[in-house]
Regions:
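N-terminal pre-domains immediately preceding structured catalytic cores
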Residues: 1-305
């Protein structure tokens, strides 16, 4: 078992769209979003880059146990490495090198995945990595600081600045308390009173009516109680975000649905307002760091428990 892997299912949040009651990191892959909770309160949200479909982010429960400043990089024996110039599988790339893609900080969360910097803002909210959570350098510095605080780890701003100043020297800070990292794949999310349906980016066929009913049941809401108009709107949103969306044809000319090509754009989200889910669900982002130097403050904060 490598650093960051967890076999303790007792600390896994239960049910779809579960809101943590402890200190943990929650990554929802299709939403391109990472949240840091401290004692059940959402502290901050980040837009992220995710693994390409060929190198997807794994799912399940991991742990963050250390923060590594100025990490070196050992390229894996993988075809994508062969396409890089001046880099060979297994040959160490030193900290601070322009050939090192990890940026100033990495946080191991169990092989083969990391949370790390080094991504340009243009890669945030997109496929951007080979099985890792990708952040900009500014994002990862901010996240590392908050993660240390949330884990009761004593490391001052001055110490962090000192670590980062010498880009060629690697420093490892062990977290005082390991922090669970939950990697979710939820394309249907009841969030702050709205139904969010995200594109099925890894083609796992999750945008189905059956899955929708499970998500609603977890919130104490029945799909049968939706109005006809609400049902049509939600099912249309599910279809649009599915792996193989179908185009609804005028029933006067055809009684069937015909299949159309799925968009190649990884990004996608439909938001449907449903009266029966008001004040229910997962919290809206808090101070969402979009990676472009701006933060989006949540419209509601009373849900961020």
């Amino acid at each position: 078992k490598t650093e960051g892997e967890s076999t303790d299912n007792k600390i896994a949040a239960a049910g779809p769209n579960a809101v943590p009651v402890d200190t943990r990191v929650v990554v929802n892959i299709p939403a391109f979003r990472m949240d840091l909770f401290q004692d059940g309160k959402l502290i901050k949200s980040y837009k992220i880059g995710i693994g390409y479909p060929e190198f997807p982010l794994p799912q399940g429960l991991r742990k963050a146990q250390s923060i590594i400043f100025n990490p070196p990089w050992t390229p894996p024996d993988s075809p994508w490495v062969a396409t890089m110039k001046d880099v060979s599988p297994g040959e160490l790339v030193e900290a601070g090198s322009k050939l090192n893609p990890l940026g100033p900080i990495k946080i191991p969360i169990g092989a083969p995945s990391l949370i790390h910097g080094g991504k340009p803002a243009s890669k945030i909210g997109r496929f951007a990595s080979h099985g890792c959570v990708g952040l900009t350098n500014a994002q990862v510095k901010d996240f590392a600081k908050l993660l240390a605080q949330a884990s009761s780890t004593e490391v001052s701003d001055q110490a962090i600045a000192s670590f980062l100043q010498d880009k060629t020297r690697t420093r490892v800070v062990k977290l005082h308390q390991a922090v669970p990292v939950e990697l979710r794949y939820e394309t249907i999310v009841v969030e702050d009173g709205k139904l969010h349906i995200f594109k099925d980016v890894y083609s796992q066929n999750t945008n189905t009516e059956e899955n929708l009913r499970k998500v609603l049941d977890a919130q104490g809401v029945s799909f049968e109680d939706f109005s006809v108009a609400e049902k049509e709107k939600v099912l249309a949103a599910l279809n649009a975000m599915s792996v193989h969306p179908k185009k609804v044809v005028d029933t006067k000319t055809s009684a069937k649905n015909v299949e159309t090509k799925s968009t190649k754009n990884a990004k996608g989200e439909n938001v449907v307002e449903i009266g029966s889910v008001t004040l229910k669900g997962y919290p809206a982002p808090v101070n969402l760091d979009t990676g472009n130097g701006t933060s989006v403050v949540a419209a509601r904060t009373d849900k961020n428990r």
